[in-house]
Curated annotation (Swiss-Prot):
NAD(+) binds at residues 10-13, 159-167. Belongs to the acetaldehyde dehydrogenase family. It is an enzyme of class 1 (oxidoreductase). GO terms for biological process: catabolic process. Pfam families: AcetDehyd-dimer, Semialdhyde_dh. Its EC number is 1.2.1.10. This is Acetaldehyde dehydrogenase 7. It catalyses: acetaldehyde + NAD(+) + CoA = acetyl-CoA + NADH + H(+). HAMAP family: Ac_ald_DH_ac. One of its GO terms (molecular function) is acetaldehyde dehydrogenase (acetylating) activity. It comes from Rhodococcus jostii (strain RHA1).
Amino acid sequence: MTTKVAIIGSGNIGTDLMFKIQRLSQTLEVAALVGIDPESDGLQRAGRLGIPITADGVAGLLDIPGFDQISIVFDATSARAHVANAAALEPFGKQLVDLTPAAIGPYVVPAVNLEENLAARNVNMVTCGGQATIPMVAAVSHVAPVAYAEIVASIASRSAGPGTRANIDEFTETTSKAIEVVGGAHRGKAIIVLNPADPPLIMRDTILCLIGDADHDAIRDSVHRRVAEVSEYVPGYRLKQDVQITTVTDDVPLSTLGRVSQ
């Protein structure tokens, strides 16, 4: 018995999610793909797969036959659109998974805090950069207090559709906040780079944590354990290089970090 889901947003993220569920999931079934452009590539491809589609947004989803059988709705639109979508769907008691930076519900990073948010009706998946990096910040903060954490997410420009590009500011704000709330850093900062390299590169992220005295081996062990946990649900997730730890003595000025973390 599969759980029926709907996906709002027929752009890159929504379409990719649709194919991942169709090809890989044994527990979920895509019962609808929702967009606003009847000529969008995502809706066309879903139609060819026999998946019910609508180009009338969330209003069209409410009218799709079998809507009452849908249990989970993934929203892959934009931060602003999700606010309206969540309000429209609230009376129907659906589980909402927010793939935008709107963050109406709690931030959820599965390897860190999934269990404590299972009862939430609207969960926010932060951002792609947040999902990749926050587990590492949390791994460090599990061993030692993190005064400041900074992440740089570099993704292929081709993978960023109009929705992602329109949400760059929200991306940095939401990810920065989640670094603090979920990652455990006192202050967080996020930077996104859309790399136009061709052929497109695989997403890479860099994480910097500023901590006090700590057991270096314990930090490395914590990071490696968390990498193993994430790789269980994100195939291919790995450290590109081993954990680097640099001791900063009192006579070395932290000119940049000092200004940011004050």
